[in-house]
Each structure stands twice: as structure tokens, then as C-alpha cells.
């Protein structure tokens, strides 16, 4: 940052507020006062899990989701970074089921195994959706630079190789895993771009370019607490 390597990013005054936000999703779940709102029972394992890893089963679940988000908003007044991942779980869960029903594939079972792993370990997962897009008047396959949308570069027996980027990824640096999803509806000609997958944050070939926040250097100034505003919590994003 500013041309210097940061060895202790956990306590860095620009970076720490973002870490504190996602940490709140864990600490409140351990607090008996908020435990009922912050946790749920997994329909896959029957275990108590963080609500951010839950697949909604009822209207009560949906209401509790909103109440949980309001609570965290009151506690942090900032983005707590697990909402898109939670929505991604629910979207991919139902979509993979419908795909398997139609095409006889096994994506749903694959995803359930991954979700159980996430639930058992209470992982933070970044929902990575927004592509750079390039020329927005053109479909992905018509882009001059095909890497403006995440795409399958190579298909192998053991999986796929992908290229591209996701932008404006709030909290991705604080996430254990990423779920990559298409950013828009795709046609047949865009089939290489119609891909969704999960990968760990330390996967080989995955890079994150740290994105700072407006006026974040104010946190470095002496006596800034006079008008700093939200000193303990804040945001960050990355180009992934």
C-alpha cells in the first residue's frame, strides 16, 4: 500500500475496520443474546450453523435473515461482507437442482457437499458476480477482450481452467472461499461464459488487487477522531 509492503495487515488502521465487520458475524453468533437470530439448524446435517451459511426453509427464515442483517447494520454501520455469499448459496442450491432435474447431471450433489463443508467450518464465502464487462453493448462472446467476462479456457478430466476477473468484490480478501457466478443472462453463443464454481482464496493463479475506500487515509491522521465518523468499522474491496 502506497508502495510499501504491509506485514501486519490485521492491525493496519485502513484494513482493520473491514476485518472487524466480518468478525462481528462470528462474535454475535457466539453471544447468547443474539444466538437465536444469528444461527439456524442445517436442513442437511441437523447441526447448529451460522445463519449466513443457511438455506432458507420458511418465511420465518427469511424474516430472521432480514432481522440479522439489520442487527449487524446497527452494530457496524458498514458492510459485513457475507450477504452476497449467503444469497449465492440459496441461488446456486435451487439452480443446480433444476439443472440436474433437466439434464441428469450431478451439480446439486456436488454443491451440497461443498455447502456442508462451509457450514461445518463456518466459512466466509465471497459471492463473486460482477465482471469488468468491457463494451456493455456487446455480449460476452463478442467482446474484443474475451477476459472481460469470466470464461472457461480449458476443459480437463479433473475440472476446468478459467480466465477473467470479478470486480468490486467487497470483503473478498476476508473470505475463505469464492463462489463465482455469471453476471448476466447468457445465450448459446456464450456457453463458455455461463459457468459457476467455487474456489479457495489461496487457489493457485488467483490474485486480488486491494481496493481502498474514499477518505480512508483520514484514519492515519493524528487527531482525526474529531470528525472521522465510523472509526472501528469500514469497507474494502478487491479486483479478483
Question: What is each model feature region?
Answer:
Residues 8-9, 45-47, 135-138:
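Short active-site-adjacent helix-start/loop capping segments
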Residues 1-26:
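N-terminal-proximal low-complexity accessory segments that begin disordered
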Amino acid at each position: 500500500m502506497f508502495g510499501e509492503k504491509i506485514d501486519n495487515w490485521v492491525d493496519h488502521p485502513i484494513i482493520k475496520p473491514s476485518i472487524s465487520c466480518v468478525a462481528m458475524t462470528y462474535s454475535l453468533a457466539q453471544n447468547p443474546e443474539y444466538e437465536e437470530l444469528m444461527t439456524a439448524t442445517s436442513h442437511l446435517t441437523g447441526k447448529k450453523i451460522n445463519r449466513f451459511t443457511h438455506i432458507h426453509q420458511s418465511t420465518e427464515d427469511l424474516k430472521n435473515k432480514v432481522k440479522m442483517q439489520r442487527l449487524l447494520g446497527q452494530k457496524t454501520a458498514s458492510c459485513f461482507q457475507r450477504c452476497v455469499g449467503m444469497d449465492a448459496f440459496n441461488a446456486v442450491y435451487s439452480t443446480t437442482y433444476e439443472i440436474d432435474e433437466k439434464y441428469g447431471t450431478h451439480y446439486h450433489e456436488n454443491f451440497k457437499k461443498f455447502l456442508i463443508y462451509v457450514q461445518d467450518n463456518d466459512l466466509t464465502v465471497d459471492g463473486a458476480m460482477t465482471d469488468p464487462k468491457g463494451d456493455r453493448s456487446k455480449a460476452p462472446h463478442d467482446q474484443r477482450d474475451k477476459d472481460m467476462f469470466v470464461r472457461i479456457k480449458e476443459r480437463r478430466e479433473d475440472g476446468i481452467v478459467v480466465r477473467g476477473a470479478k470486480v468490486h468484490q467487497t470483503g473478498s480478501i476476508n473470505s475463505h472461499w469464492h463462489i463465482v457466478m455469471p453476471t448476466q443472462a447468457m445465450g448459446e453463443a456464450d456457453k463458455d461464459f455461463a459457468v459457476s464454481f467455487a474456489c479457495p482464496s489461496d487457489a493457485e493463479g488467483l490474485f486480488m488487487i486491494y481496493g481502498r475506500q474514499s477518505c480512508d487515509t483520514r484514519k492515519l491522521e493524528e487527531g482525526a477522531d474529531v470528525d472521522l465518523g465510523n472509526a472501528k468499522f469500514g469497507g474494502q474491496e478487491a479486483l479478483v
